[in-house]
């Protein structure tokens, strides 16, 4: 069954996510406010998700990384300039330039504040557009620090040829569920768009394999 895009807010908050996956209390601003860690995870949440990491794939991947590498991971969500509002999905880049700039600044902050860190990143839904827009234009010295990127329900998948432009495909993992039409270049939201928590363990394993 297809849902109108404007129904995304209600459905997103009702999507099936367990309490453990939500990790509501998990830190999400550690790059800005905490010490440097060997691994820095930067994530852009889906439209309507609260906080900086959201309540689904973002905290799930963050928690998975922290469990695998205790006391070695800093998690950072994109925001508050990135508001994850619905209307921004209709813009030419699939999000706002303000959001892209904020993500760009976070990657640059990780590189300048923590030059020895290994960066991994991700995005879900509109957050994938944020990552496409930011990573493609990063200077090489920053881009080279990004070891892996995971994208869930990629709204730029078709437009950008199944990859992040100007970034190695072997460091990118795009998850597009069967029947998720946003991966086909539309903004038609189906139930498949809310199934990506099942891909969190695989995404964590992919990122760890790149470190």
Swiss-Prot record:
Reactions mediated catalytically: cutin + H2O = cutin monomers
Keyword Disulfide bond: yes
Site keyed Transition state stabilizer: positions: 47, 126
InterPro entries per record: AB_hydrolase_fold, Cutinase/axe, CUTINASE_1, CUTINASE_2, Cutinase_monf
Active site: 125 (nucleophile), 180, 193 (proton donor/acceptor)
One GO term describing the cellular component: extracellular region
Localization (cell): Secreted
Protein name: Probable cutinase 1
Source organism, top-level taxon: Eukaryota
Organism: Aspergillus clavatus (strain ATCC 1007 / CBS 513.65 / DSM 816 / NCTC 3887 / NRRL 1 / QM 1276 / 107)
First-listed, main subcellular location of the protein, grouped into a coarse class: secreted
Disulfide bonds listed in the record: 36-114, 62-75, 176-183
EC number: 3.1.1.74
GO molecular function terms noted in the UniProt entry: cutinase activity
Pfam families: Cutinase (PF01083)
């Amino acid at each position: 069954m297809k849902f109108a895009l404007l129904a995304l807010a209600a459905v997103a908050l009702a999507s099936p996510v367990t309490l453990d996956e939500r990790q509501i209390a998990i830190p999400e601003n550690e790059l800005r406010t905490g010490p440097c860690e060997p691994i820095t995870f930067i994530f852009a949440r889906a439209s309507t998700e609260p906080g900086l990491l959201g309540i689904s794939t973002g905290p799930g991947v963050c928690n998975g990384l922290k469990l695998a590498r205790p006391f070695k991971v800093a998690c950072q969500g994109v925001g508050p300039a990135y508001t994850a509002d619905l209307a921004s999905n209709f813009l030419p880049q699939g999000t706002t330039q303000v959001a892209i700039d904020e993500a760009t600044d976070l990657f640059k902050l990780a590189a300048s504040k923590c030059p020895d860190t290994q960066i991994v990143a991700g995005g879900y839904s509109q957050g994938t557009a944020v990552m496409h827009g930011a990573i493609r234009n990063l200077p090489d010295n920053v881009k080279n620090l990004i070891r892996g990127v995971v994208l869930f329900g990629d709204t730029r998948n078709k437009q950008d040829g199944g990859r992040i432009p100007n970034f190695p495909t072997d460091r990118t993992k795009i998850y597009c569920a069967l029947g998720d039409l946003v991966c086909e270049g539309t903004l038609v939201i189906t139930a498949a768009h809310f199934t990506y928590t099942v891909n969190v363990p695989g995404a964590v394993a992919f990122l760890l394999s790149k470190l």
